[in-house]
Amino acid sequence: MKHLPRIILILLTVLLFTSCRKSHESPTRYTAFDDLFDHSKPIAFGEDEDIYVFCGQQIRSELEPVILASLEREVALVYNEKYFNVIFSDINEMERLMRFKNLLFIGTIEEGDPVSRYLQKALDPKLQARVKQSTGEIFQNKNRFVKDQLIVQVIGLDNERLADLFTLSANRIFDLFLDRYTKRLAYQTYQMQIIEQDFFEPYPFSLKIPNNYRLYANDKNNRFLSFLYRARIQNGKHPDKFISVYYEPMEQNVLDEKWLIDTRTHIGKVQFGDSLNVETLRTESFKFAGYQGFRLSGAWINPEKFAGGAFQSYAFWDEKTRQAYLVDTMTFFPEGGKLPVLMELFMVASTLKVK
């Protein structure tokens, strides 16, 4: 009996070690987007792609084509899809619409239209002074009234300067809303745990893949790795989602748009049995995961399986490792929009880190 305390101490030590080990080895979450929302505030209304726009009649008559061309820009996939849906709104509806996710105000600090008067009352005097000094500013406010919200205010000294400011800043305004949209998608995606990072030890890169994906292909000889999300119930209401990585040695950076198209075509044929619809292909310079490279968008088809869908591929060259990468995102979703799925996959693919 005199050894009982010692035995108990040893058992407690073993249990503590085992507990710590299990805690260390248990799946983890990727928390980069956890602070996106303010959970102390009410729930937000509206769709992620709807932007409620408030502006005076004179400004609308002048800027409506620019607003629509910027925010409702399209991308050609299986068919053209819009990023956003613009809803021009009356400022008198603000009490109701203040609970919605995306609000865009366009006004001045000198004109007398209702939207400008609203902004003049709402804007801090110091910010009004900035507008007077610069003749135009863009302000953003996150989660002002509800837990998930982006408010963008485009404010000029007068209508003439306001029109110039919006026209010159149209891409920036679009990017503000797009950034918020993609982060919302990422937040939802990463509410679950991710595949353990030990999985990627044999590879020259790592990814934060949600653990509801499964391994689709692991072709080590051809340096190709692919993951697939597929819903348990196959009723057409849930998309198939693919994330794939291909890499190859490349001593000098000769990566270009042709390399991207040729490599993606080869991967589709060898790994998926697919081909690309050349009429839909679009390439552009694009920054991905901190690298300047290229993006390829379009549609894929598989006649044998009577299947098809949309894809986006990202290519870049890593100088340190002297390797070229192609990161591919692909979806099969006959009954739904492909663009939001590809935006979600982009956020997952963007977690790629080259070792």
Regions found by a protein language model. Name each.
Residues 25-147:
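Start-of-domain marker
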Residues 149-158, 242-247, 323-332:
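Short, well-ordered beta-strand elements
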Residues 30-37, 45, 50-58, 62, ...:
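Secretory pathway targeting signatures of secreted, lumenal, and periplasmic proteins
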